[in-house]
C-alpha cells in the first residue's frame, strides 16, 4: 500500500505509524493533494464551485409535527400491544408464540416495538418485486395484504412501464438483452454460469485477469483485484488491512459494509462528523499526540474511511481537504466509490477525477460494479504491492467463490464502452447525459420548493419528507401514477429525517423526468412537502441530448 509519508511498504503491509517520516510527495501534486495543472497561483480555481451542497434544516413547525406523529404512533403502539396481550386485537402475527418464549430476542426492545407497531403499518412501500430488467421503465408485480402487511399475496397482475427512479442504474447499462450483449452470451456458452471455486484454488479465469487489468487502466493505478460481492469487498478486506493496535477514523454516515469491516478488524474505531474536516483533524491530532489508550504507544496504522458519494445524503466527499490531512498526519485513506465510479467526473472515473486529483494520492480505491456497470461485485485498486498482499490475505480471495464469468464479461463490456475502447463515444455520452439529467432534476426540485440534500453533481437525490405518515402516502400515490420511488426512514436515517431517494439515470429521457417532476409538484401541494425557505432560482435551459438508443 502506498505510504503517504514516503516510508517503505513491505509485502503490502502498512508500516508502523510511528516509523513513518516526511517524504517526498507525488511529483504531480502539491501539498494539498490537488494536481498542479488544476491550480492558479497556488489555489484551486474550481474547488469552491465543485462543493456546492445543500443541507437545509426543516422549519421548526415541521419538526414539531414530525415528533408528534411518532409520539402518537408510539401511544397507539402500546395500546395495540395491550390489546394483543389480552387477545382482543384480531391480527395475532405480532404475538410471540408460546414455544418461542425462552428464545433469545433477535432485536432490542425499541427495535422490536418499532418494527411491529410503526414499520408494519407502511411496510407495503418496501421490497416491491419487479419482473423485468431495471431499466428506465420496469414492470412491477402487484401484491396485496390480508393481515395488515405482515404477509403479502400476489394478485397475478403486472403493472407495466413504471418509471424507475429507484435503481442505481446510473448509466443505463442494466438493460434487456440486445445484440451488443452477444459477448456475454458467448462467454456463457464457453465458461458456464459459475466458477465453483475460490481465487486461491481453481477459480481464477483469464476473464478475471482481463477485467482486473482493465479496471487498473481505467483508474490509472498499478493494479486491481475484483471480488464477486460488493458488500464483502469492504467487509472482508478491511480486516486484512488493519487490526489490533490500529485506529480507524470513520465518517458517521459510512455504509454498513464499511462499518462491519471496521468492527471485524478488531481495530479501535472513532467516528468523525459527516464531511467535517475539522472534526477529522481533531481526531487525527489526538491520535498522534496521545496514542493508544492506557499504553500511550503510537498507533500501528491510522486508516481514514470515507465514501465518494454518500448514498443517503447525496453528498460528495471533501477529498482535497482529507488528502491534505492524511498527508499532514501520516495516515492512510480508503475511499468507497460505490456510488461515484462511473457516475462522477468528466469521464466517469470517480471523485479523484471530479476534483482533478492524482489517484495515487488515495491509498485504497474501492468500488462496486452494481451501480454504473449493470452487474455485481466490487474491486480494490491501488499499488501493486497492496493488491498482491490482498490476494494472499483477503478473506474474499481465500474463501469466497469467484466472480461469475458472464458477470465479468458484462463489466468488461461496460468498461470498454465508458473508456471508448469499443470504437464509439456512446459511453462518454452516457456520462455527460447523466450529469445533465442530474442538474436538471435537482434544479427543478429546488424551484418547486422541496428540501433536497447533497451535491448538485450527485445522481442520488434525497427529497426530505420528514413525517412518517407522509412517507407512506407519498410512495403509494407515486405508484398510482406509475412512478417507482424508494422511500427511506429510521433506522437507515435519523428518526425525524425520513426521505424519498431518487436515482437519476442517463437512460431517463427529458419526457420521463418531466413526468416525474409534474407528479412531484402535485404531491408536494397535496401533502404539503414544499418546506424550503430558500429563494427559487430560474429554470435552467437544458436540453435533452440523449443520442443512444433506449431498449423497449
From Swiss-Prot:
SPT complex catalytic activity is negatively regulated by ORMDL proteins, including ORMDL3, in the presence of ceramides. This mechanism allows to maintain ceramide levels at sufficient concentrations for the production of complex sphingolipids, but which prevents the accumulation of ceramides to levels that trigger apoptosis. Its main location: endoplasmic reticulum. Gene3D superfamilies: Aspartate Aminotransferase, domain 1, Type I PLP-dependent aspartate aminotransferase-like (Major domain). Residues 1-29 are annotated as: Disordered. The modification N6-(pyridoxal phosphate)lysine is found at residue 371. Expressed in most tissues, except peripheral blood cells and bone marrow, with highest levels in heart, kidney, liver, uterus and skin. It is found in: Endoplasmic reticulum membrane. The keyword Signal does not apply. It is a single-pass membrane protein. Keywords: Acyltransferase, Endoplasmic reticulum, Lipid metabolism, Membrane, Pyridoxal phosphate, Sphingolipid metabolism, Transferase, Transmembrane, Transmembrane helix. It holds the Pfam family Aminotran_1_2. Its cofactor is pyridoxal 5'-phosphate. Coiled coil: none annotated. Belongs to the class-II pyridoxal-phosphate-dependent aminotransferase family. Component of the serine palmitoyltransferase multisubunit enzyme (SPT) that catalyzes the initial and rate-limiting step in sphingolipid biosynthesis by condensing L-serine and activated acyl-CoA (most commonly palmitoyl-CoA) to form long-chain bases. The SPT complex is composed of SPTLC1, SPTLC2 or SPTLC3 and SPTSSA or SPTSSB. Within this complex, the heterodimer consisting of SPTLC1 and SPTLC2/SPTLC3 forms the catalytic core. The composition of the serine palmitoyltransferase (SPT) complex determines the substrate preference. Component of the serine palmitoyltransferase (SPT) complex, which is composed of SPTLC1, SPTLC2 or SPTLC3 and SPTSSA or SPTSSB. The heterodimer consisting of SPTLC1 and SPTLC2/SPTLC3 forms the catalytic core of the enzyme, while SPTSSA or SPTSSB subunits determine substrate specificity. SPT also interacts with ORMDL proteins, especially ORMDL3, which negatively regulate SPT activity in the presence of ceramides. This is Serine palmitoyltransferase 3. It comes from Homo sapiens (Human). The gene is SPTLC3.
